[in-house]
């Protein structure tokens, strides 16, 4: 069971002064039984059950239930490395930051289970504009709630939209914007495992369409507050286009060609912005050109890629 692996990673943290809130979102497997076992073994754990109301409600409920001033999220599929909370806590203390942003790793890679204080020399303090630009490109960190340390007060003021998929797209930029001091460190703290239920692997669901509304809210915010920052505008366009292409790929599987065609036409206007952006890889540019040029060839290449992905687990 993934939840056991997840909880073990939290209990093994080098920083022990934790309040551990589990929100069981209507699980139909043995999750409840497993959590009850952990509950008896560690007094720091608090367990709450909700009737399958979704990830956003679970996060919001966790924020409401906790009593600490700082919060880190972790999904049941994933794990924190043993030093993760200590690292984020130390970064916050060293910088007095209002948010701490670290990196997410992939389970296929190998990571050290211990760390020295060298990372404290690699902390960067970002302006809001730089922090948002880096978030949209997602190289060090992205919109995912994982591997971040948030003040509880900001999460209470900016709850996750309920009943949506890609709800973090509409929330993370607000949480970063709340911060007067933003600390970033390119150190992996969370490791993600892609199960069959992961958003990246699930089939199309109408709730995924919320991405387009959420990214539009980001665009409005950027254009309103930073209308002359062309590099930031290019970054949010990058996220809009490639996030949208991924969802359109899922829509193609359901033969929703009219909707896909709408976004193909819309994204064509970004041709120069995408092609002349040196932060976008050649592979991504080819993907973009295929998408706006031919649904047929885009679909063929996507199927080949997904086949290789499934073979590699």
Descriptions of predicted regions:
Residues 55, 76-183, 193-206:
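Donor-binding/catalytic cores of nucleotide-activated saccharide
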Residues 1-12:
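Short, well-formed alpha-helical segments that are part of the catalytic scaffolds
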Residues 16, 24-33:
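A conserved acidic beta->alpha catalytic loop
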Residues 189-195, 202-230, 241-274:
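Catalytic core of nucleotide-sugar-dependent glycosyltransferases
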Residues 71:
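Short aromatic/hydrophobic "clamp" motif used to bind/position activated sugar donors
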């Amino acid at each position: 069971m993934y939840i056991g692996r997840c909880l073990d990673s939290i209990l093994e943290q080098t920083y022990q002064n934790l309040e551990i809130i589990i929100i069981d979102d209507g699980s139909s497997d043995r999750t409840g039984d497993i959590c009850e076992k952990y509950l008896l073994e560690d007094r720091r754990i608090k367990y709450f059950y909700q009737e399958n109301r979704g990830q956003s409600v679970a996060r919001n409920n966790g924020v409401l239930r906790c009593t600490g001033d700082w919060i880190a999220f972790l999904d049941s599929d994933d794990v924190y490395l043993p030093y993760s909370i200590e690292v984020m806590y130390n970064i916050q203390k060293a910088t007095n930051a209002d948010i701490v942003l670290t990196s997410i790793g992939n389970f296929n890679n190998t990571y050290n289970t211990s760390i020295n204080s060298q990372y404290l020399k690699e902390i960067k303090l970002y302006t809001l504009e730089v922090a948002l630009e880096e978030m949209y490109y997602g190289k060090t960190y992205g919109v995912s709630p994982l591997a971040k340390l948030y003040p509880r007060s900001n999460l209470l003021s900016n709850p996750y939209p309920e009943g949506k998929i890609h709800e973090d797209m509409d929330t993370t930029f607000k949480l970063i914007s709340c911060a007067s001091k933003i600390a970033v460190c390119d150190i992996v703290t969370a490791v993600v495992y892609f199960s069959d239920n992961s958003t990246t692997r699930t089939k199309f669901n109408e709730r995924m369409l919320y991405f387009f509304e959420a990214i539009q809210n980001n665009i409005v915010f950027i254009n309103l507050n930073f209308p002359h920052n062309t590099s930031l505008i290019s970054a949010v366009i990058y996220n809009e286009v490639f996030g949208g292409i991924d969802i359109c790929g899922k829509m193609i599987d359901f033969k929703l060609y009219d909707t896909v065609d709408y976004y193909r036409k819309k994204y064509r206007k970004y041709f120069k912005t995408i092609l002349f952006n040196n932060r976008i890889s050649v592979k991504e540019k080819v993907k973009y050109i295929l998408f706006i040029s031919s649904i047929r060839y885009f679909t063929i290449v996507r199927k080949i890629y997904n086949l290789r992905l499934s073979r590699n687990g």
